[in-house]
């Protein structure tokens, strides 16, 4: 499990920013707009994203297993089983409050994205090796199956009455939209 919460400053906006712009107001707070300009490309303060409330937690479990059996009653015959399993989950939430450039224009913007995935692989390998004088026989047989499945849900809310509850207030949004996705893949060879 690892935590990737927080937002970083925008270096691309810093390169485009007017050098005369002020990133902080008189009280030392980060301004949402560094320059009063009609062009969004030049007016967004590259530091304003530091005011975003962001929560990004991810978890991942991986297991790989191998079993090899050499059959003593048939010289040169062996069986190998390879298995693997991966589970991942992610919970991402970001609230752009009234103190951010985009949040101020929409009375707050909340985005959430939650997903989980699992995948597995199973490989059966039979190998036969035998030497007869100057001759050698080598045979490999493989049967493999694998699966991948991912499910995700996202929400966006805009126009909040206040900034008090950050990303725990989706039901308070005046405008909401949602999305969901599902993917499943199976392979046999």
Regions found by a protein language model. Give the residues of each.
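Residue-level signature of outer-membrane beta-barrel architecture
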Residues: 67-71, 128-130
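Surface-exposed loop/interface segments of Gram-negative outer-membrane beta-barrel transport/assembly proteins
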Residues: 1-62, 78-187
